[in-house]
Amino acid sequence: MEFPDLGKHCSEPTCKQLDFLPITCDACKQDFCKDHFSYSGHKCPFAFKKDVQVPVCPLCNAPIPVRRGDIPDVVVGEHMDRDCTFHPGRNRNKVFTHRCSKEGCRKKEMLQLACAQCHGNFCIQHRHPLDHNCQAGSSSVSRGRSSASRAAEQKPSGVSWLAQRLRRTVK
């Protein structure tokens, strides 16, 4: 049993195959089989209207014009070598931007470490006033001991503190 109305014949003059799932060319609007549906497969006279490729550069996202017959990959490669405006070294954000203000030190830090007295920017090694010879508050910073070490020395230890508290309650 045949179904003469089912499917369509390929419009290619040399083929004329009955195809149950024909593909219509979007340029010339004719029906073709799977072997002849491409523009080059049936030598479409209107292919120049549809066969336009404009690849985009993967680096700078600019459209790259491609002439007929040129391979798009080659044209994009040439653009990347010659005309591309993307420069990875120039556009990259620097991570270590805060340079140490101590003479002779060339270290850079991710975060700004400012001295509370002179407000200079220093690295981890030179962030304390004693480490960078801070001149702004020289009277409050002694060379022998810092105020933190003196406060720790004046504070009684756990056992002596407990003993003092017990003496006060006994009296």
From Swiss-Prot:
Binding residues annotated for Zn(2+) 1, in chain numbering: 10, 15, 33, 36
Domain of life: Eukaryota
Binding site for Zn(2+) 4: 115, 118, 132, 134
Protein's cellular compartments: Cytoplasm; Nucleus
Listed Low complexity bias regions: 136-151
PANTHER family noted in UniProt: AN1-TYPE ZINC FINGER PROTEIN 2A, ARSENITE INDUCUBLE RNA ASSOCIATED PROTEIN AIP-1-RELATED
Record-linked Pfam families: zf-AN1, zf-C2H2_ZFAND2
SMART domains membership: ZnF_AN1 (SM00154)
Keyword Repeat among UniProt keywords: yes
Protein name, as recorded: AN1-type zinc finger protein 2A
GO molecular function terms attached to this record: zinc ion binding
